[in-house]
Amino acid sequence: MSEAPRIQLLSPRLANQIAAGEVVERPASVAKELLENSLDAGSRRIDVEVEQGGIKLLRVRDDGRGIPADDLPLALARHATSKIRELEDLERVMSLGFRGEALASISSVARLTMTSRTADAGEAWQVETEGRDMQPRVQPAAHPVGTSVEVRDLFFNTPARRKFLRAEKTEFDHLQEVIKRLALARFDVAFHLRHNGKTIFALHEARDELARARRVGAVCGQAFLEQALPIEVERNGLHLWGWVGLPTFSRSQPDLQYFYVNGRMVRDKLVAHAVRQAYRDVLYNGRHPTFVLFFEVDPAVVDVNVHPTKHEVRFRDSRMVHDFLYGTLHRALGEVRPDDQLAPPGATSLTEPRPTGAAAGEFGPQGEMRLAESVLESPAARVGWSGGSSASGGSSGYSAYTRPEAPPSLAEAGGAYKAYFAPLPAGEAPAALPESAQDIPPLGYALAQLKGIYILAENAHGLVLVDMHAAHERITYERLKVAMASEGLRGQPLLVPESIAVSEREADCAEEHSSWFQRLGFELQRLGPESLAIRQIPALLKQAEATQLVRDVIADLLEYGTSDRIQAHLNELLGTMACHGAVRANRRLTLPEMNALLRDMEITERSGQCNHGRPTWTQLGLDELDKLFLRGR
């Protein structure tokens, strides 16, 4: 029998190369670490030069504070940093880097040259090291105030790692994405990128709102900026601001999602869950929302030392953060109206800050959003479009549409589907649109109906096309939600209680949240350490659905501290009712009926999408129509 291998210390070089496996995955990983060091050094301009996707050369140059000559060799040592001293510093760290591992890991798998000069030094100093030679060589050099780090021949001494690198273009795309993320995190810093001698982009400092919006457009594309809703909300020490894309501007991949916590880019499952919930019934199946959001919170309540790449964070009160993010985004999306979507591109974000519905959310003593009030707020409580002179008996000849003062009951809403258009106020569209654009409602006035499916309307911008069924489906759905919220969820006791086996941890969770389940129509009773009984379920649910739903909800509560599955399931049922009850294709409408539907869309939450996330209307501007007919050439 062979002797068991003995335990021994690894050499510093091998230990650093193993550590590099966590920190240095590809050239983009190197760029991230070097750029974060430059930002932590107070740089105002960072130049990045790349050759062969960063595999042959990656040079980062900044104008930061620089590193004293005596500290240069120490900067390449493991666990050497200027950013923290005590454990208490780690609990409130605001710098992007703090572990002191990056340069040591990089220098162990590449040829590294670092040149730096401080403001009070007469000359610059340079240190060189290679993967096989961990003894750095320091010598004088010429360099302005700041630091340059040059990384050549990445993985030259670890062929096994090098062969896993992708093609040059792929590696450069990853590297460019890292720079974009940091450019969005720090608007006050200029970024310049060159690849193989060609300038890719030059982003100047952005210190005012206009310049910040321009940078967002440069990084994310002008189309995103034109289809984004600016938001800013602060509540109970939590501050969220940035841009959220309209549901109609979604992507097939989650590749336009930037979320920052105290200036640090993160990809956190709690954040992702809150965002998914907010977009739940306005996003088409399989599509992903777009956003650039900045979340600021006391650093003492967030732990950034969770993952080697620092992409994950842990919040001390995760439920409060989740509810704040969800409530803010849900309200902001719910406040979007056709006139918001018809505003000139970027006009809202480039002028004065706009008030959003998210700012009106109310939080209880524990910081929880009262979702029943904020999410299911009645559209009937809003003041509809007045239409200027036309609403007050002016020249348009069209009387403004008036919603009922109180929302209908669930039974009334359910039974009134086919009679929806009967009580609508009569009135004809004006023969000609009012001269003033302010007197024209956002969706304009109906002109005709096409194939019994689409409504054609004229507004101040051109032609509006409305999917009649999809629009009515959303209006009916929102009315049903309002009715359910006002009446409450009626519970239905089970003749024979349903017993379900769970773990002790799950049973504890259900018992802890029993009052929460009760508000949603469930009554749960603990029978034993690992057993629950369902005694009552919401009247709209079937018993078989309820059993699995309780299991899923408990799993969510354990994972996120909250769950929207019950509400989502009920909303799905209401959505089905609304879909079946909405006006069908080939239903001929009169002009007054079409105009009444347009007015209703203008005051209904999320009227831009049906319950399944499909758009309900689109705008064809005069410029687009002119292009179709080659006018103006």
UniProtKB/Swiss-Prot annotation:
Keywords: DNA damage, DNA repair
Annotated GO MF terms: ATP binding; ATP hydrolysis activity; ATP-dependent DNA damage sensor activity; mismatched DNA binding
Domain of life the protein comes from: Bacteria
Keyword match DNA repair: yes
GO biological process: mismatch repair
UniProt family annotation: Belongs to the DNA mismatch repair MutL/HexB family.
PANTHER family assigned to the protein according to its UniProt record, in alphabetical order: DNA MISMATCH REPAIR PROTEIN MLH, PMS, MUTL, DNA MISMATCH REPAIR PROTEIN MLH1
NCBIfam families: mutl (TIGR00585), PRK00095.1-2 (NF000949)
This protein's name: DNA mismatch repair protein MutL
Annotated source species: Pseudomonas aeruginosa (strain ATCC 15692 / DSM 22644 / CIP 104116 / JCM 14847 / LMG 12228 / 1C / PRS 101 / PAO1)
